[in-house]
Amino acid sequence: MTMPDLHPLNASLIPLLGTWVGPGEGAYPTIASFSYEETLVFSHVGKPFLALQQRTVERVSGAPLHAESGYLRPQGDDTVEVVLSQPSGVAEIHVGRVDETEAGVEIDVSSVGVHTAPSAKLVRETRRRYVVEGDTLTCDFWMAAMGEPLTHHLTSVLTRRT
């Protein structure tokens, strides 16, 4: 099967394409700090979006921790929408900016809607930032959940594998 041509609206997101792997750290007022290993894959099918698949495992044991999947939907200017779903019962819709840089791209999005399944923990707000500089991707995540205000929760520094 041949790879379809990249849709022109995805041009600013090209630096994200590929598989990224690396360590991360998490902290939040209601839990103990922790470390993890993250794998993040950005791909395309020739349509005006990139697909995102993410998973994390405990760094020492390899036990699964988290997973999510979704789409980055560039809007033709410097705006991007990000739609994500998690098996924990959380669905997020974000809007934000894509800024092309000399070294890659910076994406900063904030939630315009967070919905939770009846059995999921209540998450009220989220923010995500992805910064590509060459073959390094730095990811940061903030959330307002469990009665806490918007607080930095996760950071990972990933290296491009493919």
Functional labels for PLM-detected ranges:
Residues 1-49, 55-64, 133-135, 142-162:
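Amphipathic/hydrophobic helical signal segments and adjacent flexible N-terminal regions
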Residues 22, 50-54, 80-84, 106-111, ...:
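Short hydrophobic/aromatic-rich beta-strand segments that constitute the beta-sheet cores
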Residues 22-36, 83-95, 109:
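N-terminal short leaders/motifs
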Residues 35-37, 45-47, 65-69, 75-79, ...:
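Short connector loops at helix/strand junctions that flank enzyme active sites
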Residues 37-43, 68-73, 93-99, 125-131, ...:
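Hydrophobic/aromatic beta-strand elements that line small-molecule binding cavities or substrate pockets
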Residues 59-99:
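Helix-adjacent hinge/juxtasegments
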Residues 87, 113-116, 135-137, 143-146:
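Short acidic/polar capping segments at secondary-structure boundaries
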Residues 89-90, 107-127:
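Acidic, glycine-rich flexible loop segments
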